[in-house]
Amino acid sequence: MSGPIDRLIAQMRQAPRAVRFADAIKVAERYFGAARQKGSSHVVFKMPWLGDPRVNLQNDRGKAKACQVRQLLDAIDKLNREERDG
């Protein structure tokens, strides 16, 4: 891991409760593209899998909610596994 997004992901794994909302958005946009919905305290990203799954990120006084950070990390891990395994 060496790039800025990789460093953010490492920080997210270390302390999911301390993730800035803007950083979570930055990571999600890198992996899943533009948000499907934004403009409120919630930002929704569509996942590339069947069934229309989503990752929802919610601004909680400048921080992303820890449970949503973990969901984002799980989605990134799944995407990386699928790319690796074909």
Give the label of every model feature segment.
Residues 2-37, 47-86:
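Basic nucleic-acid-binding interfaces
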Residues 42-46:
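Minor-groove-contacting beta-hairpin "wing" of winged helix-turn-helix DNA-binding domains
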